[in-house]
Design a protein with these regions (language model features):
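Metallocofactor- and cofactor-centric catalytic cores in central/energy metabolism, strongly enriched
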Residues: 2-425, 434, 440-515
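Short secondary-structure boundary segments
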Residues: 430
């Protein structure tokens, strides 16, 4: 398990673990600057968030951050020298998975002591944090229709229905030209069904063209969906075309509004919270501030009986052994490694993607040398508790505590899978500055550093840069984030909601051949 210090940060550099051969610059460090706490003089101009060799690192020696290997020196590196992609080699190394060897069950709070929020209790017992009506397209050919229906329901037309958060379209770019059987179609249908049945939707329409490969009948049968008072379907070729389907859809939603508006928030346990964990535009401070603080919040949520979904499989690669050791069983740990091997040995072979080493330009500018270092920070969002289950993309999440879902690293695709799996809240950390938002699950964004937070304050919900500023500890920030979970779940608007984001972020994983 990666150990996170509970001390507040002070001084120009940060030592993350006694065994590390690097430290991290908390502020810009100039050439010739003496660092008394580490007994070296800086040989480089080192930007804040970048690594500095704390002692001589010989060629081929592992570079240790949090006592975890994040690369290898490709040359001799003298103490005080900046350590980054120019002198760090990315290569494979043996990792001991030690399945379930560090498993410790979560110390659950008694139900009477658990936190609460104000949520929408659905007929099936699930709890929503928002109250939307959703309109889904089976295929891109019906995308315009579902969007036109949703656009008709302006705030003015919904003013008599104050308990409804809106009518939202979930259109996408696939549904035809793809394999009719196998994983690609199963995955798309699983994603659509997860949205259609999401607790943040009071009701849903599903609209198809009629001749697409993702046939409406096949979708309904595969996912055991049935038309009822809160789920209606239309086929454009049978309804009379574009205009008539839009009109029929509008009338169908109008009929759903009165019942949907009857939904009232009521006090429910925090155990009904399921938080999808995301990071984007990561930087050198992600593993020091926002990610471990979010992890601390998930540890708290887990004690209250809730769930946190870590995802983005390429962004745990290289540190997956720190998760398998915490798995509740060997079988759960092996599920995680099976997904890693699929990515490495089948899906990404020979491709210029980040699981093969190269991170994005923004990550590199932010101080991250390679995918191992990025993964180190990314994995921290899940906290320090046991890994309770591993899910395929968009599978329904039923386990409580810290779980993992196999998704790509691209944020909209990953969050779509999490929401389809049941996430009713998204928590998103960023160092460079992400503008992501989602529906029907609200998204809160956590800044890793104060300068970015102040520059993008309209988009950021909480400033984890205060950890770096030395005013709060990781654990204290984790408690703040947990409290923000509860307020947001109870209806407090996130920054992304205030900006109207989330209408274009439904992006199912397009995994197969397109022809």
């Amino acid at each position: 398990m990666i150990e996170i210090s509970e001390k507040r940060l002070i001084g120009p550099i940060i030592r993350l673990h006694p065994n590390d051969n690097i430290v991290v610059a908390r502020v810009d460090v100039g050439i010739g600057e003496v660092v008394p706490s580490e007994n070296f003089t800086s040989r480089s101009q080192v930007p804040a968030g970048y690594k500095i060799a704390a002692k001589k690192i010989t060629k081929g020696e592992p570079i240790l951050k949090y006592n975890v290997t994040v690369g290898f020196a490709n040359t001799d590196i003298e103490a005080g020298t900046m350590v980054h992609s120019h002198n760090t080699e990315f290569r494979e190394f043996d990792r001991d998975y030690a399945y379930a060897s560090e498993y410790k069950p979560t110390d659950l709070l008694p139900e009477s002591e658990r936190a609460t929020f104000q949520g929408y209790v659905r007929a099936n017992g699930k709890v929503g944090t928002r109250n939307f009506i959703g309109i889904l397209s089976t295929v891109n050919c019906s995308a315009t229709v579902v969007n036109k229906i949703a656009e008709w329901f302006t705030p003015e037309r919904l003013k008599d229905f104050p308990n409804i958060d809106g009518v939202v379209a979930f259109s996408h770019g696939i549904g035809c030209g793809m394999e009719m059987s196998g994983e690609p179609m199963q995955l798309l249908r699983r994603t659509m069904a997860g949205y259609a049945q999401h607790p943040n939707l009071a009701a849903a329409l599903i609209i198809g063209l009629g001749c697409e490969r993702n046939q409406l009948k096949g979708l309904m049968e595969q996912e055991a969906l049935q038309e009822n008072s809160t789920l209606h379907t239309f086929i454009m070729q049978e309804t009379g075309g574009t205009r008539k389907t839009i009109e029929a859809g509008i009338e169908a939603v109008k009929a759903l509004l009165p019942e949907a508006n009857k939904a009232k928030r009521q006090t429910v346990s925090a155990s009904h919270l399921c938080v999808g964990l995301q990071c984007g535009g990561s930087d050198g401070f992600s593993s020091i501030t926002a990610n471990p603080a979010l992890g601390a919040a998930i540890d708290i949520l887990s004690r209250h009986g809730g769930a946190g979904i870590l995802s983005e499989t390429p962004e745990i690669y290289g540190v997956e052994h720190t998760l398998t050791r915490r798995a509740a069983s060997k079988a759960i740990g092996e599920k995680l490694i099976q997904r890693i091997r699929w990515w490495k040995d089948e899906y990404s072979v020979g491709r210029d993607v980040q699981i093969n080493g190269q991170v994005s330009p923004g990550n590199q500018i932010g101080g991250l040398a390679n995918i191992f270092e990025k993964s180190l920070g990314s994995s921290m969002k899940g906290g320090t508790g046991p890994l309770m289950e591993v899910y395929r993309y968009a599978e329904p999440v039923t386990a409580k505590g810290f779980v993992f879902m196999d998704t790509p690293g691209f944020d909209p695709v990953s969050a779509t899978g999490q929401i389809a799996g049941g996430a009713n809240l998204i928590a998103f950390t960023t160092g460079r500055g992400s503008m992501f938002g989602s529906k029907p699950a609200p998204c809160i964004k956590l800044a890793t550093n104060t300068p970015m937070y102040e520059r993008l304050t309209e988009d950021m919900d909480i400033n984890c840069g205060e950890i770096l500023d030395g005013t709060v500890s990781v654990q204290e920030m984790g408690q703040r984030i947990f409290e923000l979970f509860l307020r947001t779940a109870s209806g407090e608007a996130s920054k992304s909601e205030l900006l109207g984001l989330g209408d274009y972020e439904f992006v199912p994983w397009q995994i197969g051949v397109m022809s």
